[in-house]
């Protein structure tokens, strides 16, 4: 009997242990952020009713093993923030990924509002941490340097970017829902000043590289949505580098009903430009001040003001330029060089002023209304009168000879003069209303915008070329100019646009979301009405929540603005119609873990069909449009993005893209001429007498932004023994691009710019941490939160990439293309302090 009792006890104990070992589990993982979407480290995560738990990592991430097939709750708490709770019921082996936002305060155990993950379900959306804009090694810095990781680049001196075969004018930029604009007369990256977006003021960055919603405007390529921070306490920062200096302060007042956010920046690219191939006196300068103020009158009403005042000037007194390239052909192989001696000066000025006011009414917890009014002004002037005398020929690269570096076999000589006195003033007035209504699993959004744009410009620009004593083009008895643009314009453009959009989340078991919307735009200048339906769809399988499938389709039409309206001769085409495009995008988003570190892989395939296209040429960053709707085009490609912690607690990004974009111009043809022997007449043909001709239609050809392959990498690492010493790598690669020979139908976009390859490396070290309690009361650093020092190596590979070509003719009228190159390897140091 006793043995039987012992046996039963043993069996019960064994079965209990076996049952325990077979306990069903699931996984909850995610990220905890503050009200500005910045990650919070060391947040306590505890299962309700338990005594122990885990804490979030330095990147705010956590992973928690939880029981399956039963209800439970996780409690998130952090000093100075409201404690919140999230309830779950998960199936066995199910993985739930969430984002938790904590608000400052002392109230405890609120039912948390869990933010959705729109970057997974919305097509084309890339969420970017603005803090990385302060650490990424880049000559331009700022938010745009982060965007270039995903879309590629071919110019480290500009903050402009091209998305999926579009040009710089096809990108929307919003700051706090106000649309902002860039200067229009800028011809090269070295003339650019500060970007409008101040990363120190930025709280959230949402970048759409295609297929964006109806609530965004009428352009064909991308939308960048910037939301500035909402300060909760007093703080600020100051930084100093060889390129840029800045200061910002933020805080609250009137019992937290009033907030302020003010930033001041100053930038000079002199250190970058001093190493250019053209030597001389460079005096670039750019300064801006921005401020955001909010007043919370009561729980229902808030008033917001956003202002920006920016001034950029660029002065150049060129002296000498030495360009070199190699020519390989069956007829001729040599190192070709051009020596240019300059006389003259360039002085440009760009001023931007912006004021925006917004009143927001929270009618109830489900209905929010917003009224906005803004004024944006660009005032620009471009003045230069430069004469260049050049000698062109074979350059000696034999270091043993006294003629090393000199042109020893001249092929041509001449003189050219470039002159411009251009003035432009654009004022854009806008009044808008936006609304949002939450109704169960639906979010209705609508908006209406009235715009009035006043454009006044005076263009006086010409170029003269002289070769071997003859002015080109050569007309006996006449002095002719190779290029003349002389025009004035005084335009008053009125536009009205609006949208309505419904966002639907179906039953959780289906995992389906749907966004359907319609935009309209009426332009009084050409009396054109545009209707743009747009649709997005996503599906997250219930059994596999780490995978999301999504698709989007819609119309993305772009009404003409200042640059599109101007023809190549400077005249204005006010009857120009909008460029129209229909786009289809499909993709997937997959979350997974490698070594318990989170990763996310996003893949998208797209196709854009464009009609009423206005062809253009790009020279550096200057876009010259034909001013006519005389082409059709398409762009298609695949993009892949991998975001994850390749090194624990240090997020890195890898982006790869394949793309093709082509255009077909109306009536683009040329003639081949043949002599009596049937030989095609070229510059080397002996018999130049035309006996016959044949028409050749050009057909489809590469667009100026065509680039087959792009790759971007932003990688972060740190010392395993000390996370306060970090390294950051910014790597960009882009395959070759076409370049146009002006005035040539046969050789349109026929020149090839070599692949763009660039690596920037940065090292940063924490000089002072945020443990203020360890500092002495009389320490001059007692009020500082931290101090970081950085060393940056720009263009680590010392590869001088090509941005454009200088076209020169020799004595036999043969044209040679000599590349204009960008910056070499340079160093930069930076000091950043926060308080």
Identify the residue ranges that each predicted region occupies.
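Gram-negative outer-membrane beta-barrel transporters
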Residues: 507-509, 607-609, 629-740, 832
């Amino acid at each position: 009997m006793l043995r039987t009792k012992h046996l039963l006890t043993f069996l019960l104990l064994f079965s209990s242990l076996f049952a325990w070992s077979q306990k069903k589990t699931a996984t909850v993982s995610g990220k905890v952020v503050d009200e500005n979407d910045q990650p919070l480290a060391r947040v306590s995560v505890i299962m309700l009713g338990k005594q122990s738990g885990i804490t979030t990592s330095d990147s705010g991430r956590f992973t928690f093993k939880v029981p399956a097939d039963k209800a439970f709750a996780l409690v998130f708490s952090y000093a100075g923030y409201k404690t919140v709770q999230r309830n779950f019921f998960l199936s066995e082996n199910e993985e739930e990924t969430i984002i938790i936002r904590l608000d400052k305060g002392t109230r405890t155990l609120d039912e948390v509002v869990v933010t959705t993950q729109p970057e997974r379900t919305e097509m084309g959306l890339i969420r970017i941490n603005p803090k990385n804009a302060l650490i990424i090694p880049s000559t331009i810095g700022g938010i745009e340097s982060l965007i270039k990781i995903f879309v590629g680049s071919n110019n480290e001196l500009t903050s402009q970017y091209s998305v999926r075969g579009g040009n710089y004018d096809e990108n929307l930029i919003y700051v706090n829902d106000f649309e902002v604009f860039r200067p229009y007369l800028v011809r090269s990256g070295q003339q650019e000043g500060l970007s409008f977006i101040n990363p120190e003021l930025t709280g959230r960055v949402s970048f759409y590289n295609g297929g964006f919603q109806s609530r965004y405007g009428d352009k064909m390529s991308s939308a960048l949505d910037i939301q500035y921070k909402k300060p909760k306490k007093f703080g600020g920062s100051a930084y100093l580098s060889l390129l840029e200096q800045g200061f910002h302060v933020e805080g609250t007042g009137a019992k937290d009903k009033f907030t302020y956010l003010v930033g001041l920046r100053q930038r000079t690219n002199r250190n970058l430009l001093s190493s250019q191939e053209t030597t001389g006196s460079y005096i670039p300068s750019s300064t801006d001040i921005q401020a955001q103020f909010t007043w919370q009158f009561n729980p229902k009403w808030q008033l917001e003001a956003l202002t920006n005042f920016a001034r950029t000037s660029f002065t150049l007194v060129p002296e000498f330029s030495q360009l070199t390239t190699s020519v390989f052909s069956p007829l001729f192989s040599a190192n070709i060089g051009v020596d240019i001696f300059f006389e003259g000066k360039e002085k440009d000025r760009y001023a931007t002023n912006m004021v925006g006011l917004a009143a927001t009414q929270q009618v109830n917890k489900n209905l929010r209304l917003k009224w906005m009014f803004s004024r944006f002004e660009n005032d620009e002037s471009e003045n230069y009168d430069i004469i260049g005398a050049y000698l062109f020929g074979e350059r000696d690269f034999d270091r043993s000879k006294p003629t090393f570096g000199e042109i020893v076999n001249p092929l041509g000589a001449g003189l050219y003069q470039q002159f411009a006195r251009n003035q432009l003033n654009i004022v854009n007035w806008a009044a808008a209303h936006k609304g949002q209504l939450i109704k169960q699993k639906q979010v209705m959004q609508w908006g209406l915008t009235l715009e009035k744009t006043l454009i006044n410009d005076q263009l006086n620009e010409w170029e003269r070329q002289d070769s071997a004593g003859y002015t080109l083009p050569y007309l006996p008895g006449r002095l002719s100019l190779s290029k003349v643009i002389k025009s004035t314009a005084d335009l008053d453009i009125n536009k009205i646009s609006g949208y309505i959009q419904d966002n639907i989340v179906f039953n959780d078991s289906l995992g389906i979301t749907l966004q359907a919307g319609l935009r309209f735009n009426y332009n009084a200048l050409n009396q054109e009405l545009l209707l743009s339906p747009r649709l997005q769809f996503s599906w997250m399988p219930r059994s596999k929540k780490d995978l999301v499938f999504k698709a989007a389709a819609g119309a993305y039409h772009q009404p003409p603005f200042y640059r599109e309206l101007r023809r190549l001769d400077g005249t204005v085409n006010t009857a120009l119609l909008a460029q129209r495009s229909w786009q289809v995008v499909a993709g997937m988003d997959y979350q997974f873990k490698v070594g318990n570190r989170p990763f996310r892989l996003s893949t998208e395939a797209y196709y854009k069909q464009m009609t009423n296209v206005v062809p253009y040429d790009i020279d550096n960053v200057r876009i010259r449009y034909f001013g006519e709707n005389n082409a059709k085009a398409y762009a298609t490609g695949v993009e892949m993005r991998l975001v994850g912690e390749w090194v624990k607690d240090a997020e890195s990004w890898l982006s790869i893209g394949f793309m093709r974009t082509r255009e077909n111009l109306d009536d683009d043809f040329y003639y081949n001429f043949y002599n009596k022997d049937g030989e095609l007449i070229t510059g080397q043909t002996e018999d130049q007498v035309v006996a016959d001709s044949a028409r050749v239609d050009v057909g489809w050809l590469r667009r100026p932004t065509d680039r087959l392959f792009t790759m971007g990498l932003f990688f972060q690492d740190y010392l395993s023994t000390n996370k306060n010493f970090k390294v950051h790598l910014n790597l960009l690669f882009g395959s070759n691009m076409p370049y146009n020979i002006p005035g040539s139908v046969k050789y349109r976009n026929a020149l090839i710019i070599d692949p763009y390859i660039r690596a920037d490396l940065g090292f940063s070290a924490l000089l002072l941490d945020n443990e203020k309690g360890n500092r002495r009361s009389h320490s001059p650093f007692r009020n500082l939160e931290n101090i970081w020092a950085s060393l940056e190596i720009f263009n680590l590979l010392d590869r001088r990439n090509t941005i454009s070509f200088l076209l020169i003719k020799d004595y036999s009228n043969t044209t040679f293309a000599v590349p204009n190159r960008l910056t070499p390897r340079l160093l930069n140091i930076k000091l950043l302090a926060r308080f």
